[in-house]
């Protein structure tokens, strides 16, 4: 049910803070190269070609 994306580095990232990383992780989790990870008002990330990711996100503390 969660729609969050986790950074490949192990850092947890927020869509609101870094859409580029969010998009990169969207690709990493199986989206197409041109797919975009879309943040919504609840802080969820939507990968158009993948669906909701299941890793909870927090503020990026890298």
Curated annotation (Swiss-Prot):
Which Pfam families does the UniProt entry name for this protein? Toxin_3 (PF00537)
- Coiled-coil intervals, chain numbering: none
Show where the LCN-type CS-alpha/beta domain sits: 1-62
Q: What organism is recorded for this protein?
A: Mesobuthus eupeus (Lesser Asian scorpion)
UniProt keyword Ribonucleoprotein, yes or no: no
User: What's written under domain?
Assistant: Has the structural arrangement of an alpha-helix connected to antiparallel beta-sheets by disulfide bonds (CS-alpha/beta).
One GO cellular-component annotation of the UniProt record comes to: extracellular region
Q: Name one GO molecular function term.
A: toxin activity
Organ and tissue specificity: Expressed by the venom gland.
> Do you know which InterPro entries this protein is assigned to?
LCN-type_CS_alpha_beta_dom, Scorpion_toxin-like_sf, Scorpion_toxinL/defensin
Q: List the disulfide bonds.
A: 11-62, 15-37, 22-45, 26-47
The entry sums up its family as follows: Belongs to the long (4 C-C) scorpion toxin superfamily. Sodium channel inhibitor family. Alpha subfamily.
Q: Which UniProt keywords apply?
A: Disulfide bond, Ion channel impairing toxin, Neurotoxin, Secreted, Toxin, Voltage-gated sodium channel impairing toxin
The name on file for this protein is Toxin BeI2
Q: Which PROSITE patterns match?
A: LCN_CSAB
Tell me where on the tree of life, at the top rank, the source sits. Eukaryota
Intracellular or extracellular location(s): Secreted
